[in-house]
């Protein structure tokens, strides 16, 4: 990761229909309450997720943060076969940490029909997927820039921090940054295992 971006690398088997799917509603400790996603070009999506206390969040699902996170995401494989879903989660259902992994909740999500033929969608409990053929061991990367200000900020962060980098470069730079910051701290005592846990 970088300060405002992240990169994921997926390794696939040989398959005519490999898939990456993103649950745009999920967040730490619960769900975002409304989402928007738009296909920008053959490799890119952008959008936002509104996160209110109603959807849970930090603090064991009892968080009180209220924010919108904007994203700009690019796939290394073209979005030639993609779609969306919009799960029918009743408004009176609790959307906090334990509930979003419950059987009734997951059942509703799994039974959601796929939506194709659109370039953008706004709603509650949205998801996005892209499918593509892969060869044995093929690596596919997804890079994402975020902003808590606007979509332009997410795209700018993406371009500035991660657009020209690959997974290994980003991982090495993140490792170097952590080592630089953690080298400021000197610890004494404890076992080697405890020092490793501290690090």
Regions of interest found by a model, annotated:
Residues 1-199:
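Beta-sandwich/jelly-roll carbohydrate-recognition scaffolds of carbohydrate-active enzymes
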């Amino acid at each position: 990761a970088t300060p405002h971006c992240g990169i994921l690398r997926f390794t696939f088997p040989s398959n005519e229909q490999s898939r990456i799917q993103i649950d745009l509603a999920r967040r730490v400790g619960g769900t975002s309450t409304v989402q928007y996603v738009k296909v920008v070009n053959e490799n890119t999506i952008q959008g936002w997720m509104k996160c209110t206390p109603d959807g849970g969040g930090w603090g064991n699902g009892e968080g009180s943060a209220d924010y919108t996170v904007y994203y700009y995401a690019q796939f290394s494989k073209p979005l030639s076969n993609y779609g969306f879903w919009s799960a029918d989660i009743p408004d009176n259902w609790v959307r906090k940490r334990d509930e979003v992994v419950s059987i009734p909740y997951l059942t509703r999500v799994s039974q959601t029909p796929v939506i194709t033929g659109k370039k953008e969608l706004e709603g509650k409990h949205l998801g996005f997927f892209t499918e593509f053929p892969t060869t044995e061991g093929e690596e596919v990367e997804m890079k994402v820039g975020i902003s808590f200000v606007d979509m332009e900020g997410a795209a700018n962060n993406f371009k500035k921090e991660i657009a020209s980098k690959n997974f290994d470069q980003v991982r090495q730079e993140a490792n170097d940054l952590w080592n630089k910051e953690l080298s400021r701290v000197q610890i004494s005592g404890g076992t080697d295992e405890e020092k490793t846990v501290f690090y």
